[in-house]
A protein has these predicted regions:
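Short clusters of hydrophobic/aromatic residues that line enzyme substrate/ligand-binding pockets
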Residues: 19-22, 116, 193
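Alpha-helical scaffold elements lining the catalytic groove of polysaccharide deacetylases
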Residues: 115-130
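Solvent-exposed, acidic/flexible segments
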Residues: 25-32, 120, 124, 226
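Acidic/aromatic-lined carbohydrate-recognition and catalytic surfaces
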Residues: 1-110, 149-170
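Short glycine/proline-rich turn/loop motifs
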Residues: 16-17, 104-119, 137, 235-241
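Active-site-proximal helices and loops of the catalytic beta/alpha 8
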Residues: 3-7, 14-15, 36-38, 44, ...
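Short flexible/disordered coil segments
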Residues: 56-67, 113-116, 166, 205-213, ...
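Short, mixed-charge, low-aromatic patches
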Residues: 82-87, 109-117, 210-215
Length: 247
């Protein structure tokens, strides 16, 4: 999980409220540290799920203050994108006389939480401190960036460099050409999930047409980008829900 969430019910961790508190639905921070240490002792690295596109709040605009190593970090209403939540946040901000960022979202809007303005120096400082904490304090050896379609790819490169991390993968769920563009826009500082190959395998299995496995419309068959391809199998986004869904 990316950090402690606000909800009292079990959650997968995609609604982060705290960054520097790692107690979660999966266990305590102490248990997490023991797990990472045990894996490391066995020569296995652990990848953190980094959710920084959006952030939960109390009410519309209140972020928690967190103190780590003597420094207090707190996101502000001015760190929220100007067009967050399809403009609903701006309407509420006007009603409460609250100032948002003047910058629109750099990518896709994610409704339900406050989308962060990654051009904000405060946002950048907090996230850089957070990813350093994940690597240097908790002991993670890699990052999986959630919802990277929501902010510019260049920020992933900046955060990786700030942490000194050796491996990261972005969840850029789109066509092969757009995934390739995203990798290029990170300056080839991150890998990406090879979602197109996942669909090649799905279609081959569903239709009994195994020649689809020879498709070159994926990252793994691109000689210049295959080193940045991470095979994607399945997750909670693709689980079976009803006969009408074909994910």
């Amino acid at each position: 999980q990316s950090g402690k969430c606000l909800e009292t019910y079990q959650t997968m961790g995609y609604t982060p409220y705290y960054y520097f508190n790692q107690n979660s639905s999966f266990g305590t921070e102490s248990e997490l540290r023991d797990l990472i240490s045990s894996f490391k002792a066995a020569g296995i690295g652990t990848v953190a799920d980094v959710v920084v596109n959006h952030h939960n709040t109390t009410g519309w605009f209140t972020f928690p203050a967190e103190t780590y190593k003597g420094v207090t970090y707190q996101l502000l209403p001015t760190d929220i994108t100007a067009n967050d939540d399809g403009g609903k946040t701006a309407l509420e901000a006007a009603r409460q006389d609250v100032a948002l960022s003047t910058n629109n979202d750099e990518g896709e809007d994610w409704g339900g939480m406050r989308d962060l303005d990654h051009k904000s120096q405060n946002v950048q400082n907090i996230i850089k401190a957070y990813v350093r904490y994940l690597k240097d304090d908790l002991g993670y050896t890699g990052f999986r960036y959630d919802m990277v379609k929501g902010f510019a790819a260049s920020h992933v490169a900046d955060y990786n460099k700030a942490a000194g991390i050796e491996f990261s993968v972005g969840e850029y769920w789109d066509s092969n050409a757009n995934i390739q563009s995203w990798i290029e826009n990170t300056g080839k500082n991150s890998a990406a999930f090879d979602f197109q190959f996942r669909y090649n395998v799905r279609d081959a299995a569903n239709g009994g047409n195994w020649t689809l496995l020879n498709s070159t419309n994926n990252l793994m068959h691109d000689a210049t980008l295959r080193q940045y391809a991470v095979t994607f199998v399945e997750n909670h986004d693709t689980q079976y829900r009803s006969p009408s869904e074909t994910g």
